[in-house]
């Protein structure tokens, strides 16, 4: 923020008003003569404040005792709330592992900057207002201004970093999120603080040595190089108006992209419902399989080896044109495979126009299910009938559909031609058992992996449709959860950005007005505007709690001192589980 000095001893611009300088009628007055400005009595003797008779010093700066009590109480409460709120943010980040996300690292940095403002800046500025003069010396003045400006600018820089992080996370989810690590977030946070320090601290501390003298009068505290309104106007543009403009544009883009993704998710859910009703035939007429969604979700790869059999359905397609007689035979042989919907439900997601004539596409659906009788299958050379493959939903394990498409050379021969174009004639089933090594040694190696050929019936097609529906719903659920997280992060950003604009705008508007009229703004307004900038540090933790349920729950737990109880409950639960485990081990050994 930009400090200004206008008719006051606050760290505001020093040269905006001539009321600090005695007019012609005051020329030649001896030291100690008192000049009155409203309700404040300002002495010419080294900036000391005195009573109207000029004999006694006034530590209250001309304020009444009730004014001092009111100012001290109000500002003290605000400073205390700021300190407690930001300490809660830091402690919550420490104790709750759910809050240790990349986005919350930026909020942690913002909380540190706000804590510095609550501990140092607020209290020193309150003392400055009450005493109506700076009584701590030049070094303390420069240190206070340096800390205040660096922390305030770091808050703005952190808001910029958060805005860019949200923007790239929404618009470039695949490329940016792969690089979005805690280490990279730490580098960005460090750059925000280093840039803020380089911009303000050296100039504030050493400007008097650069120009060869100190022009700040005793009893006052302001930045020496901000003695010209035009310079102050430029710093206000760079420190406030430009960042606010950038953050507003980014937030608007984030909002539009979030709305777009919401509509896409609604369309995905609607298409899933229609596909279920129409046996996976896309509304546009082109058939789509669940594998097209798997290409968009590369994270759906899990292993299920324990007590699970792995069943590979190899659906082989052939691009060739059947004869009319063969079409008639197929029409009379099987109603299930004459159903266009059934054929389309198992068709590869790639369009026939994109395939070369004579090429063969092999789509592999790897369906992991819990086969109750897999040991029996291994001990027998005969495969179970198709009825055994129809497993109830409650017995299904993790469904992991993986599509692997590859173009192969055309087969040299076909068995008496095909039944219909792009149909699935044969179903080779390959069973890989995950039994223990001891059991596997008793089984002949030739029977360990049994391959047989069965005619593909409508039951297998129904089973595949059921698995595809389940996977489609899982993908939609993942997208919906991801979108909810993005919306929550966007809500937190919008609340922080709104609070920043509301609290910082009044003071920066006064800076613009002062450029054209240096005596139009009373001193009280300057003090209120500057304090309002500090209140932004008070509001930020409230924004976190209102927009983030995890923060809110952790704050409540910390304020009610329930942290130890939660830890004890977790330890007791772990002990109970350990006892249950040790009881079961001897029973299983017997």
From Swiss-Prot:
Gene Ontology cellular component terms for the protein in this record: basolateral plasma membrane; dendrite; endoplasmic reticulum membrane; plasma membrane; postsynaptic membrane; synapse
Main localization (coarse): membrane
Phosphoserine: residues bearing it: 385
Positions annotated with a glycan in the UniProt record: 6-7, 15, 41, 48, 53
UniProt xrefs under PANTHER family: 5-HYDROXYTRYPTAMINE RECEPTOR, MUSCARINIC ACETYLCHOLINE RECEPTOR M3
Assembly, per entry: Homodimer; the dimers can form tetramers. Interacts with NALCN. Interacts with TMEM147.
Record-stated family: Belongs to the G-protein coupled receptor 1 family. Muscarinic acetylcholine receptor subfamily. CHRM3 sub-subfamily.
Full protein name: Muscarinic acetylcholine receptor M3
Lineage of source species: Eukaryota, Metazoa, Chordata, Craniata, Vertebrata
